Amino acid sequence: MAKRDYYEVLGVAKNASDDEIKKAYRKLAMKYHPDRNPDSKDAEEHFKEAKEAYEMLSDGQKRAAYDQYGHAGVDPNVGAAGAQGFGGFADAFGDIFGDIFGQAAGGGRARGGPQVYRGADLRYSMEITLEQAAHGYDTQIRVPSWAACGVCHGSGAKPGTKPETCPTCHGQGTVRMSQGFFSIQQTCPKCHGTGTYIPEPCAHCHGSGKVKETKTLEVKIPAGIDDGMRIRSAGNGEPGINGGPSGDLYVEIHIKPHAVFERDGDDLHCQMPIPFTTAALGGEIEVPTLAGRASFTVPEGTQSGKTFRLRGKGIKGLRSSIAGDLYVHVQVETPVKLTDQQRDLLKQFEKSLAEGGPRHSPQSKSWFDRVKSFFE
């Protein structure tokens, strides 16, 4: 099944700004997050689709490749043999363009030397709580990595032997191919651009010169980070080839849904049930915040759905000098499981309201005025 256009997935125009793309992704992520739709396969697919689209369009280089080449420009399966991670369209033509212009996508070659490639970037997905996002969080992660083989000390050759000059390219890493009037250089098919070959590979690393290991890294998550943001750890991606630089590690942050608060940028929203007596008579109520407790006064006659704004009780974002606000949406709660005495008191109260006329229930009067024509 063909992939949908990434801009179509997020519902934004092709010239959308980074903020518009981020806002569209946040809206879809909140709507389709698996934690909010635990039994919906359809929601899960929508969430994955939106996440993939955001990952591509929020990265300047990937977005440029996608705009020029479409899905082929960012498909990691279209790349040089053995490439992993963030390879793209240009990698598929690395050997050809690198040989002609002296530099491949993500790699280059010193004149007369072997092909040099930058290591692939790695991505690590991390879930944190809203509290950790608001206050900052230091943690450790374990990621797969590569280290020099301890048996051959990184040479790839069996102990007691050593790599030899490639007889096909004579150590150049490239061979010249001629066809008619054209002559181009290509990566040597025997040594794959290294300029050497290993007649007796190391049995431990199978000639690669490296072994897989798990590396522990310190990650400092800054206070105010938002869902979908990435933290870059330079040089902690996959190692380069033939002395090329290592790639980077990107830690992608995902914030778990909160039991009380819903985040909207630097602002927070929460639903607050209050007794109908407090709504009618007014009074002071206490609400939770990420920094502790806060209180505010509910005026007499507060209706269900009324929103109160507590300034500075939200989150201080990464690029903000002040914290956002907390919006408390009150829900007037109807009492249940009444005693006989309570029922009698409410009936007396109801009777006194009726005697007082519509001034006690202005919304009900307005509603009945609008619908009375249906009953005439």
Curated annotation (Swiss-Prot):
Record-listed Zn(2+) 2 binding positions: C166, C169, C188, C191
State the coiled-coil residue ranges.
none
Q: Which residues does Zn(2+) 1 bind?
A: C149, C152, C202, C205
Which one GO biological process term can you cite for this protein? chaperone cofactor-dependent protein refolding
CXXCXGXG motif repeats mapped onto the chain? 149-156, 166-173, 188-195, 202-209
**Zn finger (CR-type) location:** 136-214
From the Swiss-Prot or TrEMBL record, what is one GO molecular function term? heat shock protein binding
Q: Name one GO cellular component term.
A: cytoplasm
- Keywords for this entry? Chaperone, Cytoplasm, DNA replication, Metal-binding, Repeat, Stress response, Zinc, Zinc-finger
The source's superkingdom equals Bacteria
Tell me which InterPro entries the record gives.
DnaJ, DnaJ_C, DnaJ_domain, DnaJ_domain_CS, HSP40/DnaJ_pept-bd, HSP_DnaJ_Cys-rich_dom, HSP_DnaJ_Cys-rich_dom_sf, J_dom_sf
**Gene3D superfamilies the UniProt entry points to:** DnaJ domain, Heat shock protein DnaJ, cysteine-rich domain, Urease metallochaperone UreE, N-terminal domain
Q: What cofactor does its activity depend on?
A: Zn(2+)
Q: Cofactor stoichiometry and binding?
A: Binds 2 Zn(2+) ions per monomer.
**Where, per UniProt, does this protein localize?**
Cytoplasm
**Record text about domains:** The J domain is necessary and sufficient to stimulate DnaK ATPase activity. Zinc center 1 plays an important role in the autonomous, DnaK-independent chaperone activity of DnaJ. Zinc center 2 is essential for interaction with DnaK and for DnaJ activity.
Protein function: Participates actively in the response to hyperosmotic and heat shock by preventing the aggregation of stress-denatured proteins and by disaggregating proteins, also in an autonomous, DnaK-independent fashion. Unfolded proteins bind initially to DnaJ; upon interaction with the DnaJ-bound protein, DnaK hydrolyzes its bound ATP, resulting in the formation of a stable complex. GrpE releases ADP from DnaK; ATP binding to DnaK triggers the release of the substrate protein, thus completing the reaction cycle.
Q: How does it assemble?
A: Homodimer.
Please state what the protein is called. Chaperone protein DnaJ
In its UniProt entry, the species of origin is given as Burkholderia pseudomallei (strain 668)
